[in-house]
Amino acid sequence: MTDAAIVTQKLTRRFGNLTAVDGVDLTVAAGQFFGFLGPNGAGKSTTIKMLTGLLAPSSGRAELLGLDFAAHPVEVKRQIGVVPEGMGLFERLTGAEYLQFVGRMYCLDRPTTQRRSEELLDFMQLSDRPKTLIADYSHGMQKKLALAAAVIHGPRILFLDEPFEGVDALAAGALKALLGRMTERGVTIFLTSHVLEIVERLCSHVAIIHNGRLVAQGSLEELRAGIAGEEGSKTTLEQIFLSIVGQDGAQPPQLEELSWLM
């Protein structure tokens, strides 16, 4: 599929005198596994909040699935799923109760909601504690439940902010396989993670934001081609990332400053 699932034009968000996101032009094709990277404070979370309707842009526009988000917020939200940085789960519910609530919120009928809830809880290995409140889940269990809630309605775009944080290796492998199958049937996945090895392994295309501005965008092959020298094809995503975000002359922390710890 080649149609664009996400298009932004000069997307900007200001907080007083601070410009957190500055004129971002982004294009994500339908069915892409897309990685969105940047240092801490670069504007990643602010961008995702604008793309998912949690923040209104100061200027510019975001179009999802051919719809202007500002003009058609309800229609867009019906077709997206989100696992945010702060999961915001209702901790006084059980996992099953929460998924049934989310399913009904998306207007799924009760039999469909019940069936999908049970299937998702089984897949996420959460069905063995039917009476356990979410408040008593581990962080990894809560992350898996948040992902289950984000996909229960069959979204066409899935936004994931650090989805594997706290998830054990066995479950993470199953989740990665599931996400890969979803992209094969045309679902667009927009992933942010500080674990660049995960992004490199899963994503076909990447964008890098730095100081609120988009500084790179393209396939991994295109980004590697931008690295000078014959070794460019062997360059890792981490090396690409450090090369790009380090161009402003920022220096890494010096260990000598903490000599009293060594």
Describe the residue ranges of each PLM region.
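Helical segment within the ABC ATPase nucleotide-binding domain
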Residues: 172-185
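ABC ATPase "signature
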Residues: 217-218
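Catalytic Walker B motif of ABC-type/P-loop ATPase nucleotide-binding domains
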Residues: 158-162
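Conserved catalytic motifs of ABC-family nucleotide-binding domains
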Residues: 154
